[in-house]
Each structure stands twice: as C-alpha cells, then as structure tokens.
C-alpha cells in the first residue's frame, strides 16, 4: 500500500530523515513535514538528497523528487551568440564576497508562475548561518561595483546543491551558473543539483536523473574529503570574458 501522508519529523535536529525513496508520488517528492532549519538538520538533508521548499504560512516541507534535475558541470549550454557577446564582456566574477546580497536578490526576483517567494526570511537566515559555517556559497557577477547576477547553494564533500540564481542584468544568472560549473568541473566535481526542472533550466542544459541514480551519486560525492570554508581566495577574481572559450558543451 503506497503512502499518502509525509513523514512527521521529530523536533530533535539530529533525528534522521526517512529514506528518500519513501517520498510521495503526489505531490512528487514530498517526503517529510515539520522539524526546523537547524544547520545539522539541513546538512543531513542535503547529504541524503533532500531539500526544504515551502512558502510563508506553510509548515516546513522536505522534498526528494523523482526524477531529479541536475547539471553536468561540463555540459552547461551557452549558445554561439552568447559566447560571442562574452568575448567583449567586462564583468568580473567572484565567490563568497556578497552571499547575503545574492540570496536577497534571489528572494526578491519575480518567478514566472510563482506568487511570492519560497526564500523566506527564515530560509535566508538559515543559509546565512550555513555560509558562516563554510557550507553555503555564492558565485557573483559584477559590473564594476554593481551586482548583476549570482547563484548560491550548499557544498558537502564534493557535491554542490544549487538553490537559486538571479539576473540583475541580461545574462547575469547564466554567467554565474557557467562560472560555477567551469570551476567545479576543473576540481573534478561532476554534477550540480538543480532540484526541480523548469523550462529555463532545461534550456541551459539541465538533465533528469532517476532518483535512485542521483542518490547513489550524492552518497559517493558527499563522502569525498573537502573541508568547509570560504571560496573567496580559492576562486579568486576572474573575468566573465574568459568563459567564452571554456568548453562546457
């Protein structure tokens, strides 16, 4: 008999999640309800292929959809026209220098078909805490001193779990994603989790993985040694124009 109700989480942030395979089929991927956004619970969730997604006024909802949307770090789609534009682009790229601004911009960016944002104040505080602990990271795109794009997510071991991205100017989010993918590919990290598909992600080269395959990949990657910490020095400052010649597809 299939389950029709999600698992109710214990108040203890150290309590385990149920196996992701027990997630509901309708709504797709809903696994658990309740709990909190304590860093221990969040990191445990991501390490098992689970993420929080809820709106203001809703209880905390935890998901593991099937299939899972991912990006291969060597397969971000940049059109020939976009690459030509990149060659003369004067924007610069940095990491972990404006995390709070990136997550705030993602929260305030309108999304087609969405009324309001799921990046609530509660969510922002939780990910700022993970950032201070060295687990949540951002890649930022600057036009001079102005932030024009960015992406943020969570890194555990050698697996990056993307959360959201934004464009403050045309192409800003695409450049942030491509820059993140190029850096991770160079480090040998093969995938970026993109959670749930939408048309924009698919145009950028996102792919669908069966949940079982995704969970196997996550288990392998999060177990690889990679200490938490700031990415600012590790990433350095780069020029967006350098992405024009990076082979990602």
UniProtKB/Swiss-Prot annotation:
EC top class, as a word: transferase
Acyltransferase in keyword set: yes
Keyword Hydrolase: no
A GO BP entry: protein catabolic process
Subcellular location: Cytoplasm
GO cellular component, as recorded: cytoplasm
Annotated segments matching region Disordered: 1-21
GO-annotated molecular function: leucyl-tRNA--protein transferase activity
Reaction equation(s) it catalyzes: N-terminal L-lysyl-[protein] + L-leucyl-tRNA(Leu) = N-terminal L-leucyl-L-lysyl-[protein] + tRNA(Leu) + H(+); N-terminal L-arginyl-[protein] + L-leucyl-tRNA(Leu) = N-terminal L-leucyl-L-arginyl-[protein] + tRNA(Leu) + H(+); L-phenylalanyl-tRNA(Phe) + an N-terminal L-alpha-aminoacyl-[protein] = an N-terminal L-phenylalanyl-L-alpha-aminoacyl-[protein] + tRNA(Phe)
One Pfam family of this chain: Leu_Phe_trans
EC number annotated for this UniProt entry: 2.3.2.6
Main localization of the protein described in the UniProt heading: cytoplasm
Keywords of this entry: Acyltransferase, Cytoplasm, Transferase
Superkingdom assignment: Bacteria
Function: Functions in the N-end rule pathway of protein degradation where it conjugates Leu, Phe and, less efficiently, Met from aminoacyl-tRNAs to the N-termini of proteins containing an N-terminal arginine or lysine.
Family: Belongs to the L/F-transferase family.
Name used for this protein in its record: Leucyl/phenylalanyl-tRNA--protein transferase
């Amino acid at each position: 008999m299939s389950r029709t109700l999600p698992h109710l989480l214990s108040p203890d942030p150290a309590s385990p999640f149920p196996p992701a395979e027990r997630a509901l089929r309708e709504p797709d991927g809903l696994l658990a309800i309740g709990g909190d956004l304590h860093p221990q619970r969040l990191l445990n969730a991501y390490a098992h292929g689970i993420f929080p997604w809820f709106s203001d006024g809703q209880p905390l909802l935890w998901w593991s959809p099937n299939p899972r949307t991912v990006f291969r770090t060597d397969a971000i789609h940049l059109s020939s026209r976009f690459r030509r534009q990149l060659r003369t682009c004067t924007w610069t790229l940095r990491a972990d220098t404006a995390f709070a601004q990136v997550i705030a911009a993602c929260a305030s960016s309108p999304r087609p078909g969405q009324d309001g944002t799921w990046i609530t104040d509660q969510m922002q505080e939780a990910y700022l805490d993970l950032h201070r602990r060295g687990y949540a990271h951002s890649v930022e795109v600057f036009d001079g001193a102005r932030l024009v794009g960015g992406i943020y997510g969570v890194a555990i071991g050698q697996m990056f779990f993307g959360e959201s991205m934004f464009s403050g100017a045309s192409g800003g989010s695409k450049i942030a994603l491509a820059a993140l993918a190029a850096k991770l590919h160079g480090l040998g990290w093969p995938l970026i989790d993109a959670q749930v598909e939408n048309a924009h992600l698919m145009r950028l080269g996102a792919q669908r993985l069966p949940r079982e395959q995704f969970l196997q990949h996550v288990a392998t990657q999060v177990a690889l040694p990679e200490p938490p910490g700031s990415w600012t020095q590790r990433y350095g400052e780069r020029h967006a124009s350098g992405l024009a010649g990076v082979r990602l597809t």
